């Protein structure tokens, strides 16, 4: 209604309302590693567990079957249903589930308006060769573990690091000769601090992160 674009991670959090309410504590919803912490927190507030998964529809499809997840989603917009569907990303089926929710008085615009304000970057690509992108991840990983507690670092798919400002991500693209960067702060100032941290880490590896 408001003409706003809704990213796939937040749309997945909204669609979690369509999952059957029984045994929520035993059901895990998957979001890919690029997803907002707001989406994770919202899913957990509904009584589900939330799991960070690798980006890529093949990775998500594999994981949804492994843990019998009722729902998974990527920031890019791929939505996977495993409760009453086959566990793969079907845009038409996702649209039907969305329309079913709205027909039952779950309105997407109202849901989005209840979420805390997010200060999140777009997905930023830093182009470099495959050799360089994996070497860069390895080099930055060593520096990260010298600075951060291991509990604040996820290495499932690149590096996702949490700190007092929010979180940042550097990962190797699955489809391009590029690194993918994203960060989300608790305020505009925090987002800028995260940007500068990632920019300096990449600069030390001879790579440039342009202003977004």
PLM feature spans:
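Phosphate-binding and adjacent anionic-ligand microenvironments
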Residues: 21-182, 188-212
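Short Gly/Thr/Asp-enriched flexible loops that form oxyanion-binding sites at enzyme active sites
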Residues: 1-13, 39-40
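A conserved helix-loop-strand patch within extracytoplasmic ligand-binding domains
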Residues: 14-22
């Amino acid at each position: 209604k408001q003409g706003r674009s809704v990213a796939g991670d937040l749309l997945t959090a909204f669609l979690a309302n369509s999952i059957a309410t029984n045994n929520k504590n035993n059901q895990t919803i998957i979001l890919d590693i690029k997803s907002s912490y707001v989406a994770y927190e919202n899913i957990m507030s509904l009584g589900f567990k939330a799991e960070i998964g690798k980006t890529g529809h093949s990775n998500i499809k594999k994981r949804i079957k492994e843990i019998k997840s009722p729902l998974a989603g990527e920031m890019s917009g791929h939505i996977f249903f495993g409760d009453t569907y086959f566990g793969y990303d079907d845009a038409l089926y996702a649209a039907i589930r969305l329309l079913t929710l709205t027909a039952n008085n779950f309105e997407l615009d109202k849901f989005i308006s209840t979420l805390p304000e997010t200060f999140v970057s777009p997905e930023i690509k830093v182009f470099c060769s495959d050799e360089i992108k994996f070497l860069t991840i390895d080099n930055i990983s060593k520096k990260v573990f010298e600075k951060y507690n291991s509990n604040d670092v996820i290495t499932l798919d690149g590096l996702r690091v949490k700190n007092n400002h929010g979180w940042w991500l550097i990962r190797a693209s699955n489809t391009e000769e590029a690194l993918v960067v994203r960060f989300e702060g608790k305020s505009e100032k925090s987002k800028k601090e995260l940007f500068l941290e990632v920019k300096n880490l990449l600069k030390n590896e001879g790579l440039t992160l342009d202003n977004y």
